[in-house]
From Swiss-Prot:
PROSITE patterns per UniProt: GLUTAMATE_5_KINASE
Regulation of its activity: Inhibited by L-proline as part of a negative feedback loop. Also inhibited by L-proline analogs 3,4-dehydro-L-proline, L-azetidine-2-carboxylic acid and L-4-thiazolidine carboxylic acid.
Designated name of the protein: Glutamate 5-kinase
Family membership noted in the UniProt record: Belongs to the glutamate 5-kinase family.
Binding of substrate, residues: S52, D137, N149
Species classification: Eukaryota, Discoba, Euglenozoa, Kinetoplastea, Metakinetoplastina
Length: 263
C-alpha cells in the first residue's frame, strides 16, 4: 500500500459532524487531535481541510428546530465562527495559519469561480497556510439537507488537484455487511469499483447532526473513481490508523478506493 502514496503530493482531509460534536458539546479534544494530525501531515503533504459541523456547533449555543431549514442555516451561521476559532487556536500551537473558504457546489460548476477558488488555494498552500473549506450553509441547501460535505469534499479534491481524499468519519470503513446488524461484517481493505446498488442504498447517519451516511461517502468515492482519483475512508475517532497509513504506509484498517487504472 505504500506504493499508492508515492504519487500523493496533495490531500484533502474531510471531517464529519459526528467527530466534531459530542453530547451537544463541541468535542475540543478531537479538534485538538485533528489539528495535531494535520500538522504532522503537513510535514509530508500539502493539506486542504474540508470541515462539517457548523450546524452542530451552533446548536451547542442555541437550540432550534433543525427540521426548519432557515433555523438550520442560522445555526450554521453561528457555528462556523466557533469552529474556525477552535481550528485557528489549535493550529497556532503548531505554528500553522489557517484560512476560511466557504463554497457551495454551484461555485464549482462555474469555470470562472472554480479558477478563482483554485488560485486562492494555490496561494495559501504556497505559504503553508491550511485552507479550511466548508459548505456555505447560510445560502446553500443541497449539502445542508443531505451529504455532510462528502460530495463537496470529492469536488474539492478533483478541482483543486488533490491526489487523495481522506474522509475521517464515525464510519471506519466500507463493510461487507452492516456492522450494526451482522457479526460477520468485515471492512473491505481495498475497493476498485462500486455497483449501482451500492450507491442508492438507504443512508443511515449515526449522529443526529450528520446528514450523510455510508452512501454519500460511496458516492464521493465513485465520483473520484470515475476520474482516476483515490479516496481513503477511516475513523475520525481513532486517528492512529489513518496516521499509520498516511505517515507510515501501513494499511491495517479503513478502506482505500482506487481504480486499477489509476494505481
Amino acid at each position: 500500500m505504500a506504493d499508492i502514496l508515492k504519487s500523493v503530493k496533495r490531500i484533502v482531509v474531510k471531517v464529519g459532524s459526528s467527530i466534531l460534536v459530542d453530547n451537544q458539546e463541541i468535542a475540543a479534544h478531537r479538534i485538538e487531535a485533528l489539528c495535531q494530525f494535520i500538522a504532522d501531515l503537513q510535514t509530508k503533504y500539502e493539506v486542504i481541510l474540508v470541515t462539517s459541523g457548523a450546524v452542530a456547533a451552533g446548536y451547542t449555543k442555541k437550540e432550534m428546530d433543525k427540521s426548519y431549514v432557515p433555523n438550520k442555516q442560522a445555526l450554521a451561521s453561528m457555528g462556523q465562527p466557533l469552529l474556525m476559532h477552535m481550528y485557528y487556536t489549535e493550529l497556532q500551537k503548531h505554528g500553522i495559519l489557517c484560512a476560511q473558504m466557504l463554497l457551495a457546489a454551484y461555485d464549482l460548476d462555474s469555470r470562472k469561480r472554480t479558477i478563482n477558488a483554485h488560485n486562492t488555494i494555490e496561494v495559501l498552500i504556497s505559504h503553508k497556510v491550511i485552507p479550511i473549506i466548508n459548505e456555505n450553509d447560510a445560502t446553500a441547501l443541497e449539502e445542508l439537507v443531505f451529504g455532510d460535505n462528502d460530495r463537496l469534499s470529492a469536488l474539492v479534491a478533483h478541482h483543486f488537484k488533490a491526489n487523495l481524499l481522506v474522509i475521517l468519519s464515525d464510519i471506519d470503513g466500507y463493510y461487507t455487511e452492516n456492522p450494526r446488524t451482522s457479526t460477520n461484517a468485515t471492512i473491505r481493505s481495498v475497493v476498485h469499483e462500486l455497483s449501482p446498488d451500492d450507491l442508492v442504498a438507504e443512508a443511515t447517519p449515526n449522529n443526529r447532526f450528520a446528514t450523510g451516511g455510508i452512501v454519500t461517502k460511496l458516492q464521493a468515492a465513485q465520483f473520484l473513481l470515475e476520474r482516476g482519483g483515490k479516496m481513503y475512508l477511516s475513523s475520525g475517532f481513532h486517528l492512529e490508523k489513518a496516521r499509520q497509513f498516511l505517515l507510515g504506509g501501513s494499511h491495517e484498517i479503513g478502506t482505500l478506493f482506487y481504480s486499477r487504472v489509476s494505481s
